[in-house]
């Protein structure tokens, strides 16, 4: 996708404009349809109803066609409503293979240039496939008429690109996106943007005593990786640590998943994808903040060496864990990753994981579940998600749940107290390793993928939380 800003007098193939039921049409748009526009609006040939689209040829040579986007009553249009209008318009153009497009941002409320660039990038994303019959990709060339500077376009395009990177990773099959391949993806990002990168190998983990991460990896023939990225934009300030679960395929181990539940487990590294998407955005936009990214990467397989229910393992923090469910593996890899992140003395820790099926039961597929030990941290993050429309909902992090995680006859903790309240148990387990550090846990198991296409993209991976994470860390500088 290419973005340009040029003189409005240039020749235009398709011009996208907003049209409202209670605001006059700008004269330069009216001039394209001498003595006709008001009549067409009056009889419904051009609709001002919110979400209605009309593509019409013009009566002049400067602009070939105009796509009218109905805004309804413009003052009642929310940011997310506007986002979905742009997404619908972008997909309308894509369906007709109209690739050279000019958008008159001045006809939309507040000239939302960043939102236009972001949404066009998100909504026209194409899922990578591995079919032998290739297809032509939609190569969009967009020009914006606006008083806003290029920086707004760059921000929106960068956030869309970063989100789409996360989408691509979540979609990749587990035989191609192994732990070493995920480490390579991190290396590509680090080299492209100059981030600091460290990759811990299995021997390094053994030396550090990462028994929880290593236990999950025991059944695999593919070695684990602990991926550590650093973005330094604020000197010696303490970093914000972002930890993403990177289980590249999850069989459930000996607590094996059913045949329907195991399909799609290539996407059990959605948290890791969000972290890498964040670092892609940081590299493009360079805010004045320090960010640490930690990704524990492994698959969870079955073999004669795999860990088992009733095993007792020792984490990097020294806490012992009774294994009651080998399919509760995400919290184990996060435990060691969070412990490692604390070595950097971060000002806060945010972890993201496709952690539990329980969050889908509780909140469905539109809302991410959250736990926290810091109300202010949650409130600041929630405020950001209301702008990005990546909704979160805080679940109770209270003693009644914490005590059940600590209930074991043979170890300090157990990894799966039961199914009732399962989402909270998963987060509370991770909370046992954060100590007093301000911490936010995000369970994205319901929001990491969508079962049907929307105005913001095709079915499948969503790249959830990339945009919210970026806006949050930028404001925490």
From Swiss-Prot:
Signal peptide: none annotated. Mn(2+) 2 binds at residues 245, 250, 268, 329. It is found in: Cytoplasm. GO terms for biological process: proteolysis. Keywords: Aminopeptidase, Cytoplasm, Hydrolase, Manganese, Metal-binding, Protease. CDD domains: Peptidase_M17 (cd00433). The active site is at residues 257, 331. Its cofactor is Mn(2+). GO terms for molecular function: manganese ion binding; metalloaminopeptidase activity. The keyword Cytoplasm applies. It is an enzyme of class 3 (hydrolase). Binds 2 manganese ions per subunit. Mn(2+) 1 binds at residues 250, 327, 329. GO terms for cellular component: cytoplasm. Its EC number is 3.4.11.1, 3.4.11.10. It holds the Pfam family Peptidase_M17. It comes from the Bacteria. It catalyses: Release of an N-terminal amino acid, Xaa-|-Yaa-, in which Xaa is preferably Leu, but may be other amino acids including Pro although not Arg or Lys, and Yaa may be Pro. Amino acid amides and methyl esters are also readily hydrolyzed, but rates on arylamides are exceedingly low; Release of an N-terminal amino acid, preferentially leucine, but not glutamic or aspartic acids. Belongs to the peptidase M17 family. Presumably involved in the processing and regular turnover of intracellular proteins. Catalyzes the removal of unsubstituted N-terminal amino acids from various peptides. HAMAP family: Cytosol_peptidase_M17. This is Probable cytosol aminopeptidase. It comes from Exiguobacterium sibiricum (strain DSM 17290 / CCUG 55495 / CIP 109462 / JCM 13490 / 255-15).
């Amino acid at each position: 996708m290419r973005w340009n800003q040029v003189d409005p007098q240039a020749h235009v193939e398709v011009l996208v404009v907003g049209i409202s039921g209670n605001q006059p049409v700008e004269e330069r748009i009216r001039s394209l349809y001498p003595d006709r526009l008001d009549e067409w609006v009056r009889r419904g040939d051009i609709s001002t109803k919110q979400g209605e689209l009309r593509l019409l040829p013009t009566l002049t040579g400067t602009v070939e066609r105009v796509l009218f986007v109905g805004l309804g009553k413009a003052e009642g249009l929310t940011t997310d409503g506007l986002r979905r209008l742009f997404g619908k318009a972008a997909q309308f153009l894509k369906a007709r293979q109209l690739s050279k497009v000019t958008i008159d941002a001045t006809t939309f409320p507040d000239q939302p240039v960043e939102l236009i660039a972001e949404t066009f990038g998100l909504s026209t994303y194409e899922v990578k496939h591995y079919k032998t019959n290739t297809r032509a990709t939609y190569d969009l060339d967009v020009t914006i008429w606006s008083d806003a500077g290029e920086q707004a376009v760059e921000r929106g395009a960068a956030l869309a690109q970063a989100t789409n990177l996360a989408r691509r990773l979540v979609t990749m099959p587990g035989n191609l996106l192994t732990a070493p391949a995920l480490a390579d993806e991190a290396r590509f990002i680090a080299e492209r943007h100059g981030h600091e990168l460290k990759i811990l190998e299995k021997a390094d983990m053994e030396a550090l005593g990462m028994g929880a991460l290593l236990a999950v990896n025991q059944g695999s023939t593919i070695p684990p990786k602990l991926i550590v990225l650093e973005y330094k934009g604020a000197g010696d300030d303490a970093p914000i640590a972002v930890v993403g679960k990177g289980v590249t395929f999850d069989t459930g181990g000996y607590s094996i998943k059913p045949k329907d539940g195991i399909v799609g487990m290539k996407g059990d590294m959605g948290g890791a994808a969000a972290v890498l998407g964040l670092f892609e955005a940081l590299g493009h936009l360079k805010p004045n903040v320090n960010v640490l990214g930690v990704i524990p990467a492994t698959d969870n397989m079955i073999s004669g060496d795999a860990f088992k229910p009733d095993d007792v393992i020792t984490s990097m923090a020294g806490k012992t864990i009774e294994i009651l469910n080998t399919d509760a593996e995400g919290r184990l890899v996060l435990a060691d990753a969070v412990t490692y992140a604390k070595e950097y003395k971060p000002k806060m820790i945010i972890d993201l994981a496709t952690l539990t099926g329980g969050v889908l039961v509780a909140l469905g597929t539109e809302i991410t579940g959250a736990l926290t030990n810091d109300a202010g941290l949650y409130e600041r993050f929630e405020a950001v998600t209301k702008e990005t429309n990546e909704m979160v909902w805080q679940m109770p992090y209270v003693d009644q749940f914490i005590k059940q995680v600590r209930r074991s006859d043979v170890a300090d903790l157990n990894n799966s107290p039961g199914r009732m309240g399962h989402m909270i148990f998963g987060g509370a387990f991770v909370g046992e390793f954060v100590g007093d550090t301000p911490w936010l846990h995000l369970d994205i198991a319901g929001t990491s993928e969508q079962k049907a296409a929307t105005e913001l993209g095709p079915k499948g991976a969503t790249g959830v939380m990339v945009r919210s994470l970026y806006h949050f860390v930028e404001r925490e500088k």
